[in-house]
């Protein structure tokens, strides 16, 4: 009801105000100090990790990967942290980290449920013929997911499936933002798209995707003009809105579209040293 909605919004305002009043921001050298303690008092590594967090800001993501060189350094890329994780253990490619990883993959975004494998037959034929990995963000029938997992296990295709966003309006916004970032077109039966045979022209692309149990990191190429324009529009809308619920929604969109990913490339002189560093 309207009264319930109003009450929730007022409670949200009070909780946010209390948290802002009682919280302590981690800034400047404090980041280095925390990172140094977390890496067994390795000041140099702590400083590198601190630099990574400063580079991406509050909305960014910091992750790490092994480097082929002895030096540890930070690489900044554009990308997004999408809050959906592994859907099937057979999609895992990195058994050590328990992650599903794809490089230079095509991206398929589907808002309507995929009910049978024939609906994506043209997509599968396209990526298999051209040896392109495929990231699917969609809800689908278990039988479809099982068929894809089986073909991935047999080595017929490099594929990963993660669920579509969960809720109504937010679902469409998240998919639209993912579409802008990857260059894909969202397949939506409600808008007249033919779900009987989804075509390759709907596909976008990403440089890399890493899916763990909880979420997925999607690295993309340099942000397009469309994304940059959307970011500016959201900033204007943020400055004009007064509704707490709308503020939260817009802030999430802004973070999603403008976020950076810092990759700490961990260098070492041996496999033993590399394992010891990454374990920290």
Description of each model-found segment:
Residues 1-11, 15:
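Hydrophobic, well-structured modules enriched for small/aliphatic residues and gly/pro motifs
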Residues 13-280:
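Long, structured protein-protein interaction/assembly regions in large complexes
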């Amino acid at each position: 009801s309207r009264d319930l909605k109003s009450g929730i919004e007022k409670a949200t305002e009070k909780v946010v105000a209390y948290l802002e009043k009682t919280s302590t921001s981690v800034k400047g050298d404090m980041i280095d100090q925390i990172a140094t303690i977390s890496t067994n008092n390795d000041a140099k590594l702590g400083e590198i990790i601190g630099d990574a967090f400063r580079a991406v800001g509050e909305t960014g993501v910091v992750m790490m990967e092994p480097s082929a060189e002895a030096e540890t350094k930070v690489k900044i890329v554009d990308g997004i942290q999408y809050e959906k994780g592994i859907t099937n253990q057979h999609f895992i490619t990195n058994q050590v980290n328990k992650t599903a990883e794809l490089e230079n993959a095509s991206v398929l975004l589907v808002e309507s449920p995929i009910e049978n494998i024939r609906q994506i037959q043209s997509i599968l034929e396209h990526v298999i013929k051209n040896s392109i990995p495929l990231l699917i963000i969609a809800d689908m029938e278990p039988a479809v997911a099982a068929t894809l997992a089986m073909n991935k296990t047999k080595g017929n295709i490099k594929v990963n499936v993660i669920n579509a966003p969960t809720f109504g309006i937010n679902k469409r916004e998240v998919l639209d933002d993912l579409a802008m970032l990857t260059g894909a077109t969202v397949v939506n039966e409600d808008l007249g798209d033919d779900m009987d045979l989804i075509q390759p022209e709907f596909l976008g692309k990403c440089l890399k995707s890493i899916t763990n149990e909880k979420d997925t990191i999607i690295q993309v190429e340099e942000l397009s003009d469309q994304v940059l324009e959307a970011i500016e529009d959201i900033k204007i809308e943020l400055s004009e809105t007064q509704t707490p619920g709308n503020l939260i929604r817009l802030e999430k969109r802004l973070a999603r579209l403008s976020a950076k990913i810092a990759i700490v490339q961990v260098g070492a002189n041996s496999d033993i040293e590399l394992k010891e560093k990454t374990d920290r």
